[in-house]
Amino acid sequence: MPHSQTSAPRGRVRLARGASPWLLPTVATAALSLVRARRSGAAKAVAVPATALAAGMLWFFRDPEREITQGRVISPADGVVQSIMPWKDGRTRVAIFMSPLNVHVNRAPLSGTVTSVEHIPGGFVPAFNKESENNERVVWHFDTELGDIEMIQIAGAVARRIVPYVPQGTKVEQGDRIGLIRFGSRVDIYLPEGVDVDVEVGQKTVAGVTRIDRD
């Protein structure tokens, strides 16, 4: 059964929190240009791209309801598995690349308590570049049934703003919305030693739906 607190009627779509700085001006510009287009032929040349941009922004910042999959660890992000790497401390890092066409809202991979939310300044190189590990990022730590789980939201060349939704000390349920990366980028999750990965490089993931560990 899906998680009761995050499941909702299918087909319902909301807009992501933290999107208003981009949505409000583009939608307002589109609305104004459409009004002016009725009176001026020249204004139609502005109305078409302005309306297309507003429609694109509404699509980019969609935040659909999800029926949350039960499992020990679920994907925190929509995207494609970019890499799976063993870490020196025994953990396994699963990196998920988020394109501008993916849903940008990230979700809690497990239930637990947010023990740390740290913003680290950095660069803005493309997320598929190895140097993106030095990009601006937000490092999360969760106290869960599996122990400490680390998750990192990494900004990319386009995504230059990460918006955490919940502060340190918050108790979250698996699949809860916890943050937004504007226009996509990358999310890394570190699985504890002894937890086997059940996804592969190139596989598509859906936040709150795709399970990334194996029993």
Swiss-Prot record:
UniProt record similarity statement: Belongs to the phosphatidylserine decarboxylase family. PSD-A subfamily.
Organism: Streptomyces avermitilis (strain ATCC 31267 / DSM 46492 / JCM 5070 / NBRC 14893 / NCIMB 12804 / NRRL 8165 / MA-4680)
Pfam families named among the record's database cross-references: PS_Dcarbxylase (PF02666)
Name of the protein: Phosphatidylserine decarboxylase proenzyme
One GO cellular component term noted in the UniProt record for this chain: plasma membrane
Key words of the record: Cell membrane, Decarboxylase, Lipid biosynthesis, Lipid metabolism, Lyase, Membrane, Phospholipid biosynthesis, Phospholipid metabolism, Pyruvate, Zymogen
GO molecular function, one term: phosphatidylserine decarboxylase activity
Positions carrying Pyruvic acid (Ser): 185
PANTHER family: ARCHAETIDYLSERINE DECARBOXYLASE PROENZYME-RELATED
Cofactor annotation comment: Binds 1 pyruvoyl group covalently per subunit.
Transmembrane segments: none
Localization, UniProt: Cell membrane
Active site: 185
Highest classification ranks of the organism: Bacteria, Bacillati, Actinomycetota, Actinomycetes, Kitasatosporales
Assembly and binders: Heterodimer of a large membrane-associated beta subunit and a small pyruvoyl-containing alpha subunit.
